[in-house]
Every structure is written in C-alpha cells, then in structure tokens.
Amino acid sequence: MKIKNIWKDVQEPLEMHTDNRGSIVDIFYNDNIQHVAYIKSNKGALRGNHYHKETTQYVMVTKGVMKYWYKPLDNSDISRFVLVRSGDLLETPPNEIHAMEFPEEYTEFIVFTEGTRGGKDYESDTFRTESIIC
C-alpha cells in the first residue's frame, strides 16, 4: 500500500496548474486505467475484505474519511490501517487484502483500476476473505 495527497505530492510527470480560477492537478498521466467508479458510503459501512490477483486498485477520497485496512495475502501478521482523507490517493497492489471502514457520517471516493474490475467483470478478479478489520 502506498499513499500520497494529490495536492501536496505532485511529482513528475504529474503537474498542477493554479491561477485566479483555482487549481487543476493531474491524478494520472499516461497510465493504463481501465475502470473508474464513484462510491458513496454511510457512517459505519464496511467494504472490501478481499484481494485481487491481477488488479492494481487506486482509491481517492473526495469527501469524508476512510479507515483503510490492509495486509499482504501470504502474511499471518495482524492487519494495519491508515486514515485516508480528502485528496489522498492510495495504491493497493495485487495480492494485498484490503478493507474499508467509514467513521464519518458520509464519505465519497473514486476507485481507479488497472485491470478488469467493472461492469459484468466486477467480481472476476475479486477474492473474498475473512474480515481483517480489528
């Protein structure tokens, strides 16, 4: 799992442009994103508790806070979590179990994927696990 804030950690080849109208920041440039989904979650909701064998998944919170739990698939250690806030973008590589918990009233986020993950293929690279939320 990697995490960065899109407004604070702008690195080449990504760019940010700011003027009197506001700001535009690149989230991806020249990447192989094959699916994008916008998700809304209510307070107390749990999502995930799964991993992907081939898909790399990126999650960007646009509103609210997410408690993001993760651990490598072949690791018996206890899972860890990070708080993901508005503007944070995190990357989940293949074979990393992940789950999401929503402590605030309302959270919105966008999921970008490299690999099959949407429409009729939504579950084709999703492998469910027991809960990793402690």
Please annotate each region the language model reported.
Residues 1-34:
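A short, N-terminal "cap"/entry segment at the start of jelly-roll beta-barrel domains
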Residues 24, 49, 68-69, 92, ...:
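Short beta-strand His + acidic residue motifs that chelate non-heme Fe in jelly-roll/DSBH
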Residues 50, 56-61, 82, 90, ...:
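His/acidic/aromatic-lined binding-pocket segments of jelly-roll/cupin-type domains
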Residues 20, 54, 88, 96-97, ...:
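A generic "binding-loop/recognition-motif" signal
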